[in-house]
Amino acid sequence: APQKITRDADGRITTLYRQYRNQGQREVSGIDLDLRQRFTDKDWGKLTLAGQLSRVLRFAEPLSDGAPLTDGAGTNYFGSIPKWRGVTSATWEQGKWSSTLTWNYVGSYAQSTHLDESVAAFSTFDVTSSWQVTPAANVTFIVQNLANKRAPWDYSASGFDYTQADPRGRFASLKLNYKF
């Protein structure tokens, strides 16, 4: 609209007013599943198996004001919305020690500009080990992306999609907790 543009005496644009507009409609549906099972043995300790799985069935918005709803589930129309996402883990606790192996999964999704192309699914493994030094002190060693897996290529995001993957690759940290 002409009132959204300000020009100088020579006709050059000096200000462009861009305002967000409420599209007013969004339909979202999905399924979340969370399972957890704990096994205890007096000699071996505790083993906890856990799994969380999410499936986006529909994520629909209009592409422009007055347009019909477009389903963006499994695409990056409205930001990256993979249909599948999951985290599974196994935690073993024995005495003052505990260790967890975690598998993180993000499903593939189609490119909004080229629906015949997609960003590949991505999964990583993380390992965490903790030692309860005293009732007040705990030391934890964490390795994220244990296999140093690279984020999948996404040409629409200048290389990779930072909302779905971490560019750092393998990352280790040491955490010390002390409760006063």
Positions of the model-derived regions?
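Flexible, surface-exposed loop regions and adjacent strand-edge segments
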Residues: 1, 65-72, 107, 116-120, ...
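Gram-negative outer-membrane beta-barrel transporters
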Residues: 1-109
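Asparagine-centered polar/low-complexity signal
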Residues: 21-23, 115, 145-148
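A short, compositionally biased micro-patch
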Residues: 26, 93, 122, 132-134, ...
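Generic long, charged, amphipathic alpha-helical segments
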Residues: 100-105, 112-128
